[in-house]
């Protein structure tokens, strides 16, 4: 018999060492050096000497905080007792203004090393540090409902959440009680909560048809909590109240309609400030044709329509294109051309840009807008490009493309969309030279 020998994989060895933390990175991790290694330690702050269990890979080591030898004067007690277990908030041990300071410092360092120059840094957009989330997505598994644990798919059951809007946070204890009474646990995918005054909504994502008794319990819970109840297996169904509920939010003197499963920005206050700043920076006029790429349900499209001659809104999801069109019609705006288009398709993007634009607004998801930025850089392109990003890594890549193509980065600012977390959101304005 032939024997096949396989080389055993070497397990990575970890060792506890002392590390002096000098900065935070764009993931909110403490950064320091030890024995020639660059060390990343979640939960550590600049100025602290910590002990960490380090696992090295090349010249970099990832660490797990074991203790603090010296504690930063900036460290504060977290408001939430789930911190350290729940993966939702990474920075509650640091005051919100200092969170922004270190996020901006980390971004400046990244851009400096990439050779990207910023004309002017603008003050960050700020809002409430807690109680700001108007949407929540709760995981459900084996009868547990909550948020994912740090670095794991395990669920931490929660009865409160400091960053959730109080209208959503108040529902958590009753949801835990409700879940314990349901028989069809394995049919529950996850739960999405949404608060858009005056309405609160709950959408249960299902993998199969719920037992009749379970659905009756969901309806009874919704009635007792005054929550609009929806389920989705394939199509979305509203179960309570009987009359259709009109979900939406005001913005820039407009009313934007929203479906229970639609993507919206989680932070209403920052969203309002973000749109106002975008309009001020891009400054569209009644003689201009403007592109709104990754347009969603019209969060930027409709404010642009109020100011520009014409707006072409491009989105990859047909349902969002339809929502954008409906929102424009409901607000009496007739200068919107909403299209469904794959912005990762170079040919489609080339054809789109060939029609000509004076200005463009880009608001992509985390993968960024590489194909679109390549096309903008390669052609004559609009004179102004405003880029809203939720991922500095892909934004940095795309910014380099625009700069290489003749654009200048004239101003940049952070937006505190996700206070208490490591997430970094930014807005940047590029102007074509010459």
PLM regions and their residue ranges:
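Rossmann-like S-adenosyl-L-methionine
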Residues: 2-26, 181, 209-434
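Terminal RNA-binding accessory module
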Residues: 1-82, 152, 165, 338
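Short acidic-glycine loop/turn motifs at beta-strand connectors
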Residues: 34-35, 57, 140-144, 150-152, ...
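Extended interfacial segments that mediate partner engagement and assembly in macromolecular machines
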Residues: 66-78, 84-188
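Residue-level recognition of conserved beta-strand edge/terminus positions
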Residues: 53-55, 139, 431
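Short, solvent-exposed loop/turn elements at beta->coil junctions and helix N-caps
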Residues: 122-129, 190-193, 234-238, 413-417
């Amino acid at each position: 018999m032939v024997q096949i020998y396989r080389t055993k994989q070497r397990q990575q060895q970890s060792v506890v060492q002392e590390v002096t933390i000098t900065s935070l990175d764009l993931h909110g991790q403490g950064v320091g050096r030890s024995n020639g290694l660059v060390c990343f330690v979640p939960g550590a702050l600049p100025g602290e000497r910590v002990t960490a269990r380090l696992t090295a890979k090349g010249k970099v080591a990832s660490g797990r905080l074991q203790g603090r030898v010296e504690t930063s004067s900036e460290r504060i007690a977290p408001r939430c007792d789930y911190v350290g277990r729940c993966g939702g908030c990474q920075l509650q041990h640091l005051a919100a203004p200092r969170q922004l300071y270190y996020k901006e410092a980390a971004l400046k360092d990244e851009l400096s090393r990439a050779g990207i120059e910023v004309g002017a840094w603008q003050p960050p957009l700020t809002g409430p540090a807690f109680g700001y989330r108007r949407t929540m997505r709760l995981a459900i598994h084996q009868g547990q409902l909550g948020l994912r644990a740090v670095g794991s798919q395990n669920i931490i059951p929660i009865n409160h959440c400091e960053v959730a809007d109080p209208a959503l946070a108040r529902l958590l204890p009753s949801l835990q009680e409700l879940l314990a009474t349901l028989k069809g646990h394995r049919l529950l995918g996850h739960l999405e909560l949404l608060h858009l005054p005056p309405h609160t909504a709950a959408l249960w994502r299902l993998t199969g048809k719920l037992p009749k008794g379970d659905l009756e319990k969901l309806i009874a819970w919704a009635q007792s909590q005054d929550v609009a109840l929806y389920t989705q297996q394939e199509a979305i169904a509203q179960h309570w109240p009987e009359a259709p509920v009109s979900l939406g939010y005001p913005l820039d003197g407009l009313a934007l309609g929203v479906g229970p499963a639609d993507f919206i920005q989680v932070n209403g206050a920052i969203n309002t400030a973000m749109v106002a700043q975008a309009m001020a920076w891009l400054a569209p006029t009644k003689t201009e044709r403007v592109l709104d790429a990754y347009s969603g349900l019209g969060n930027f499209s409709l404010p642009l329509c109020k100011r520009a001659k014409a707006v072409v809104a491009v989105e990859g999801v047909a349902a969002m294109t339809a929502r954008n069109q409906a929102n424009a019609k409901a607000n009496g705006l007739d200068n919107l051309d909403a299209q469904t288009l794959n912005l990762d398709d170079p040919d489609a993007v080339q054809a789109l840009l060939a029609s000509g634009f004076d200005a463009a607004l880009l608001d992509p998801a985390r993968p960024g807008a590489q194909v679109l930025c390549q096309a903008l850089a390669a052609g004559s392109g609009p004179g102004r490009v405003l880029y809203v990003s939720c991922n500095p890594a892909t934004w940095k890549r795309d910014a380099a493309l625009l700069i290489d193509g003749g654009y200048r980065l004239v101003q940049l600012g952070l937006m505190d969309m996700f206070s208490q977390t490591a997430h970094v959101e930014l807005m940047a304005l590029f102007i074509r030279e010459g």
